[in-house]
Amino acid sequence: MNKLVYSALAITLCSVPGIASDNWSSLDQELNSLSASLQAQNQGGPKLGGWLRSAFRSSSDLQTGGSDIQGFELNDARIEITGDAGNTYSYKISFGVETGTAVLKDAYAKWEIANGVNGKMGRYKVAFFQSSLIPESRLLFIHRSALGDIFSSRDEGFEISGEFEQIQYQVGVQNGTDGQGDEYRFTARVRADLMGNGTGKTEGAYGSGDETNLSAAVAWQDEGSLDDGMVLGAEVQMTSGPFSVAGEAADFDEGTAGAFGITNGILDQWGIVGGDVADTTPWGVTGSYMFTDMYEAAVRYEDADDTEDTTSIRVAVNRYVAGHDIKWTVEWQTVDTDNAIDDFDVLGLGLALSF
């Protein structure tokens, strides 16, 4: 009897590891399947990102509500959703919520038309200057350049883009100032990487490497709803070790009856109404130097080429906590103008954080 009991116990004990082994094997397979599923979701599903930018401004020359400017501002609170939809199609949707209300920025689909040729349709930023295409979180200063601001608007339309070796191009058509009317805004841009790997979508020398990188571009735009609505643009950017330099210029046609409907970019950044950009050739140049791995000094000079002789000088120092993802910016700007507002200086301290 005891032999039978012992034999039964032995058989049971021997069979348990086999059952457990089968169970663990099944569990491993389920975990591996779940892991693969999550990886697939992470690769093709929506990705959330964005940035926050805020600043403290001080000026004894500019006023708000009858008092000198000396307070805080929220420059950007951006939320971006991007992802792959499959079959070479991808998408991007972004909102600005700094005003307390969500404002649609980008909303477009992008797909591959042919090898090296892409299509884009929806609401997107016009491709004209590099300074307007660079995200606000990757700037050297608290504000964009004046020309970068002018050409950073978004509109609904269709764009074809591509690249061939060191050449990149964009050709697009958007609704323009008459909305869904029968006149369109046409834009074309060609950019070439002339040395090294070219410069990326970041202002300044941070992260550019030790080699010399040089890029240049020309752009053309025609606003069909204006009698003479053509704009020509040219730009160049270079980085070499700790140094960077960039320049840009635009030539505006006469518009309709001498008006383009766009005011002086330097003054417009401060809510000041200046002269129209029609029949002007504004330009600007920027230089920077990284004097340590964490600090970069920059200076920018801009000339609006307007009847009010408006010019601007900006000087800034960036402190990179985690590159452009977390950085502090100390900035001083002086504007010389014959506008009724007269000359003014502004001090600023900004913080930018990307996620």
Residues covered by each model-derived region:
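Outer membrane beta-barrel
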Residues: L34-N197, G204-D210, W283-T307, T311-I313
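Extracytoplasmic loops and strand-loop junctions of Gram-negative outer membrane beta-barrel proteins
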Residues: D61-T64, L139-R144, A217-W220, I266-G271, ...
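N-terminal periplasmic/intermembrane-space "pro-region" immediately following the signal or transit peptide
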Residues: N2-R53, E165, G200, F355
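Outer-membrane beta-barrel "beta-signal"
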Residues: F186-N197, R319-V321, I326, D343-F355
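A generic beta-sheet turn/junction motif
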Residues: A114, G162-Q166, M238-P242, R319-G323, ...
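Conserved active-site loop/cleft motifs that coordinate metal ions or position small ligands
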Residues: A297-R300, A316-N318, D325-Q333
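Outer-membrane beta-barrel and related beta-rich outer-membrane complex signature
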Residues: L62, L133-P135, A257-G261, D342
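Detector for outer-membrane/organellar transmembrane beta-barrel domains
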Residues: R189-D306, T311
